[in-house]
Amino acid sequence: MTYVVREGDSTTTGGMVLSASGSQTWEDRRLARMGDPVWCERCAQVGFIGQGNPTFIDDLVAVATDGHAVRCACAEGTHRLIASQDQLQADMEAAIDIPKDMADKARKRARQMTRARLESHEPLT
């Protein structure tokens, strides 16, 4: 499906999108994009959105849609996004992988968020 994923939407591992776009919303929830942080319940780490739909762009970043991959400590391809709404869609079903430089920044941010969670001993969910 090409339904757009938003902040707070869940994932196939029981996780959720932690934060998203600062400029675009749908039904008062920010749109998720490549590189945005995602909590993974299975590996207990913060990962990031590793794919986006090139037909829906927000601030020069591809927006994530249902089924796009999350990168975390889980095996590649086992952690996917689940859209919670069925109205806002990208123009077509498509996926591009996050560029290396963007992935490096997202990975660094995810590690910082995981470390902060471990130091605070507070669950993210």
What kind of region is each of these model predictions?
Residues 1-125:
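Intrinsically disordered, low-complexity proline/glycine-rich segments
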